[in-house]
């Protein structure tokens, strides 16, 4: 687990997300509290629970990204789900325990990648031996192998085609019990049993020497790793460091005077209660306790209110942060200050065609103005509106770029208004096009 301070986490988030200071601080503190808990001993460590977060704000203002980025920074398993995808136990659909099973799968991938890095040097040497076997045969003399090894390391053999044998991981069929989503994971794991019964199956692949290395290094790494250790570590990481982001939680809040579907929505909330507080979920790798998993929930709450959630669920989300709608200045900063801003992306994309793009300050002002106006008059979709506007403005250049190698295009306010101004003013048209 990383030991970044809250200030460092917020500083990292500032590179990618504009504004939303309160939400950034809440997530940064929650992440730091994870590290603090790890420093405690015995009983106190067990007693310290994460303070789950409820983010309230319109779409496109950074809720998901504020949750995802710190998880990536900490190397923690992160899963994003939408509350509306789940149904009450007993109904057709996914049950909420699938969230934890997905989290464990992600944790296993993370741990395996980390362990592969530890054995990469040894795996690389083993992969080199297998490439030599494919090139000169296993019975070749040491002198011949050394001669080819030098050529290999100098890159002289990169384009030569060889045949390699690799593990056939996709050989076993995956069984699922009809009407019981996830049952193949928790109850029966016929796929694993069949895989073991059939032994380590391999398949032959034809590839170039250069392309064979990543495949063989992965194959050799897996041979050097203890899979049981990976699973145990992944279960621990899921329990102690896992982050679950549940979006659209407002859609399962029972609205006053509602009926029918409200029963099922309330059922999903009741199923979430034990998950968010403390339960043990059975996965095919073993049981996972959820009491130290951090849950971050979010919703726009346009129609319903946070108080429409079940009181018990509200109590399990003690930290509330409100995210503000984006202003004109926010849009300007999103276009110019973020690490991989849309403007930087389009400039880089056009450079691949040897076309140069330049944006004037008044063009950025015009783009921000149009995005704000459209969000106000059509539908507020936050920063995502900029993608639609930029795509419309640069449509002609993107289409003709292959024929304009060496050209320079200067995007100014006049160009932006020429391409989009009329559409933005015509509300009926902009509803369909922007």
UniProtKB/Swiss-Prot annotation:
Taxonomy, superkingdom: Bacteria
Location of the protein in the cell: Cytoplasm
An annotated GO BP: proteolysis involved in protein catabolic process
GO terms for cellular component: HslUV protease complex
CDD domains documented for this protein: RecA-like_HslU
Key word Cytoplasm present: yes
Alphabetical keyword list: ATP-binding, Chaperone, Cytoplasm, Nucleotide-binding, Stress response
PANTHER family: ATP-DEPENDENT CLP PROTEASE ATP-BINDING SUBUNIT CLPX-LIKE, MITOCHONDRIAL-RELATED, ATP-DEPENDENT PROTEASE ATPASE SUBUNIT HSLU
HAMAP family per record: HslU (MF_00249)
NCBIfam families, per the entry: hslU (TIGR00390), PRK05201.1 (NF003544)
Entry function: ATPase subunit of a proteasome-like degradation complex; this subunit has chaperone activity. The binding of ATP and its subsequent hydrolysis by HslU are essential for unfolding of protein substrates subsequently hydrolyzed by HslV. HslU recognizes the N-terminal part of its protein substrates and unfolds these before they are guided to HslV for hydrolysis.
Family that this chain belongs to: Belongs to the ClpX chaperone family. HslU subfamily.
Protein name per its UniProtKB record: ATP-dependent protease ATPase subunit HslU
């Amino acid at each position: 687990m990383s030991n970044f301070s809250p200030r460092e986490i917020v500083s990292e988030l500032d590179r990618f997300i504009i504004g939303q200071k309160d939400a950034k601080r809440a997530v940064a503190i929650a992440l730091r509290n994870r590290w603090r808990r790890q420093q405690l001993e015995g009983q106190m460590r067990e007693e310290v629970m994460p303070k789950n977060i409820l983010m309230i704000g319109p779409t496109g203002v950074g809720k998901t990204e504020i949750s995802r980025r710190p998880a990536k920074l900490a190397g923690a398993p992160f899963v994003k789900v939408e509350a509306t995808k789940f149904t009450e136990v007993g109904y057709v659909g996914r049950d909420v325990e699938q969230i934890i099973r997905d989290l464990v799968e992600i944790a296993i991938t993370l741990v395996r990648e980390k362990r592969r890095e530890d054995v990469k040097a040894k795996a690389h040497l083993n992969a080199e031996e297998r490439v030599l076997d494919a090139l000169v045969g296993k019975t070749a003399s040491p002198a011949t192998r050394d001669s080819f090894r030098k050529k290999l390391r100098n890159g002289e053999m990169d384009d030569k085609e060889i045949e390699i044998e690799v593990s056939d991981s996709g050989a076993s069929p995956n069984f699922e019990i009809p009407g019981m989503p996830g049952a193949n994971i928790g109850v029966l794991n016929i796929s694993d049993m069949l895989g073991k019964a059939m032994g380590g199956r391999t398949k032959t692949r034809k590839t170039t020497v250069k392309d064979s290395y990543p495949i063989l290094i992965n194959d050799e790494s897996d041979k050097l790793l203890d899979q049981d250790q990976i699973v145990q570590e992944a279960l621990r990481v899921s329990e102690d460091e896992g982050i679950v982001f549940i979006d659209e939680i407002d859609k399962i809040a029972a609205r006053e005077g509602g009926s029918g579907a409200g029963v099922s929505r309330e059922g999903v909330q009741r199923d979430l209660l034990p998950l968010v507080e403390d339960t043990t979920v059975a996965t095919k790798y073993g049981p996972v306790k959820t009491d130290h998993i951090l849950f971050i929930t979010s919703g726009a709450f346009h129609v319903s209110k946070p108080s429409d959630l079940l009181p018990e669920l509200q109590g399990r989300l003690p930290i509330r942060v409100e995210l503000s709608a984006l202003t004109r200045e926010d849009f300007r900063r999103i276009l110019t200050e973020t690490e991989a801003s849309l403007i930087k992306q389009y400039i880089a994309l056009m450079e691949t065609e040897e076309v140069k793009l330049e944006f004037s300050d008044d063009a950025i002002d015009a783009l921000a103005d149009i995005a704000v106006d459209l969000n106000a008059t059509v539908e507020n979709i936050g920063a995502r509106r900029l993608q639609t506007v930029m795509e419309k403005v640069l449509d002609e250049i993107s289409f003709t770029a292959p024929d304009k190698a060496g050209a320079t295009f200067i995007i100014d306010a006049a160009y932006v208004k020429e391409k989009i101004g009329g559409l933005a003013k015509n509300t009926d048209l902009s509803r369909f096009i922007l």
